[in-house]
Amino acid sequence: LDYLTANVSYNATYRWDRGATIDGTKLGNTIANQATWNADGRINFETLYNKVPIMRDVTKRFANTRPSNAPPKRARKFERTYRLSPDSSLVIKHNLRNKKVKVTAAKTDGTPVPVRFKAVDQNSVEILTRSDQNLKFTIVEILKEERSLARDIGEYALRFVLSPRVSVRYRNTRSLSLPLFQPNIGNIFGQTHSAGPMAPGLDFAFGFTDQSYVNRALERGWLITDDGQTSPAVWSRGNELNIEVNLELFKGFKVQLTFNRTDNRNSQMQFMYADMPTTYSGSYTKTHCALFTALRSPKADNGYYSKAFADFLGNIPEIRRRVEAQYAGTDYPSTGFLAGSPHAGQPFNPEVGTVGETSSDVLIPAFIAAYTNTPAHKQYLTPFPDFSAVLPNWRITYDGFINLGNMRDIFKTFTITHAYQCTYSVGSYTSYLNWAQADGNLGFTLDELTGMPVPTSPFNISSVAITERFAPLFGVNVTLKNELQLNAEYRDQRTITLNSAAGQVVEAAQKGITLGLGYKIVGFNTVLKMKGSQQGVSNDLTLNADVSFQHNQALIRRIETNYTQPTSGTNTFNINFSASYILSKRLTVAAYFDHQVNSPIVTTSSYPTSSTSYGLSFNLSLAR
């Protein structure tokens, strides 16, 4: 199993804080625990598949080795004149120790004659052509196997299968903070026997607890249940899964894929009350892909039209229909605000209260579908999808141009990069206080205007966001033979936020191009033929210059009125130059110049500005 490595660890902490006593009233102690599972594993498919001979040969072909300086091996050949027979074939013994050979024949005057042949063994061939003439035969061994397009495609595909290196990391955290705890701490594992069995218990000390622990503590009388003290029990649970896949389709072409899902949940229980009301909150993030709606530039002359936003509005009726269809056959609960209500226990009736088109249960799936270019009837409805809905981000680099032609005579390095990063996130959410559960995440809340139950999920999600970055969309980094460094890149990013509470979508976009130049003059004193340079110090002069142009724009799109309003926008031009010179082991002098011009797109929000800064800096190192 040399292709597989794995590590698993578990850590738990237990904390006990003594509570105060005020005017004879005990406020109770506070106990808390935290447990963390960490697991990571790595799989090297190349090591695994190298155990198969044919795959090992393919790996050797694509091995990242430098070309040898040894002269190329010359093919051996055999030449001799034979007379063919009209009645039988001719066997020629060439002793080249190679079954793969090329056979040609010519008359005595040099005229080529086509002949048919087959290899007998590594040292002999049989001439199948029959005639009555003298021919000069030339037999040359084939050093390199002749390749076909189909075979090349097959081997590249096999190389793609061999190349992955997969890394998986999983982290699970759980914690519980429980106030109003009466027993005092004990001597062994923090356990006391003064309140019956071990309190708070070894399961608490080692982090193996869930929400049922509070019920057990109440049954054993460990908790103060005075409703004048309302400090809640607080649970936290987090799950994070990261998968990283590294591929190398061919030499120099590297692809890194990343998958991530992070789900954090918090609960607060007021256990001192009879019905023990519980509220929930949390956050959620996953890697996403909105590539099909990316790289769009809304213009003022068409009202900042966005096809994705138009699709979002068009998705709302279909998503609302699908959400409401989940309640078919569901009965109104008989708990919470519905206890004693005439609707309690009755089948769900849309005429009493239906799913609203402006609810987060409808807007969030419609939003994700539109900006991911997914049909509304195929879009998942949950705002917290599982790992099967996680989409990859990627980074691609290629440095193989240096191996083409005479590129090495011009460049030391030549690298092309492209990266795509996108996340879907629920920044924070809370649960409805009056939510009554019907089945799973299906339930009802009270409509304050009509006094009727309306179907909804348990969570009040005010906003979700899709953040996308091409970092860069295209980038080039070059170092010439004379150490001159050149770089250029184009970046594009956007953040699209759905604010369901305000009924709007906010789009913030940023795109820009950067050109850079760098040069390092080693031993600048020597270049100027200056005296006095210190021994062991290279008086290097480093020069850097960057020119960039950046476009920023922010829009608010109203859902109810289908109206778009620009809120801000600027075009920024920047020139930056810096120089750094090493005077001695301890002293470095640097100079900089920066000029920036901002031109507003929305003139009502700002005005044109320009700024210039320049200066000198001295860096004195006092370290020995």
Question: Which residues does each predicted region cover?
Answer:
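Exposed, low-structure sequence patches enriched in small/polar residues
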Residues: 1-128, 134-624
